[in-house]
Amino acid sequence: RRLDHPSGHWQMPQGGIDENENPEEAVWREMKEEIGTDNADMIKQSNQWINYEIPSETLATLPWGNMYIGQTQKWFAFRFKGREEEIDVSTENPEFSEWKWSDHNLLVENIVPFKRVVYEKILIEFKELFN
C-alpha cells in the first residue's frame, strides 16, 4: 500500500531508470530499494512499454504535486526465492506502508483506478504465468 496516496489502494513496486542504467539494472535496484530484498529470479519481461497519466485531480492530492504526471513502464515478473521475513517495506526511503501477496484475479480491483488499464494489459501479457 502506498504511503503517499490517500486512497488506500495498492500498487506493485515500480520506479524510474537512472542515467546510464538499463531497464534490467533498474528493476533489480528498485526491488532492493522498495522491498528490501532482491532474492528472486526474473522469469519474464513485457514485450511492450505501457503508458499511463495521473489525473489532474489526483495530482492535486499528492505530496509531490506535478513533479511526475505519469510514467512509461516496462514490466517484469519475478519468482521470489526467499522467506517472507526478507521483505521489508520500511526501507531507507519508504514508499509503502505495508505489503501483501495477492491473487492475480484480485489485483486490478485493488489498484488505484487510473492504473487499472496498465495492470489489465500486463495480466493479459503475463497470463501463462498464472496457470
Go through each PLM region and give its residues.
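N-terminal strand-loop-strand
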Residues: 1-12
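Structured beta->alpha junctions
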Residues: 1-2, 16, 41, 111
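The catalytic Nudix box helix
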Residues: 12-48, 103
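Short, well-ordered alpha-helical scaffold segment located
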Residues: 16, 82, 106-107
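Active-site-adjacent beta-strand/loop module that shapes the phosphate/pyrophosphate-binding cleft
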Residues: 50-86, 100
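Short, charged, solvent-exposed linker or helix-capping segments at domain edges/interfaces
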Residues: 86-91, 111-113
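A short beta-loop-beta micro-motif enriched in histidine and acidic residues
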Residues: 92-96
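Charged phosphate-binding loop/patch that engages nucleotide di/tri-phosphates or the phosphate backbone
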Residues: 104-131
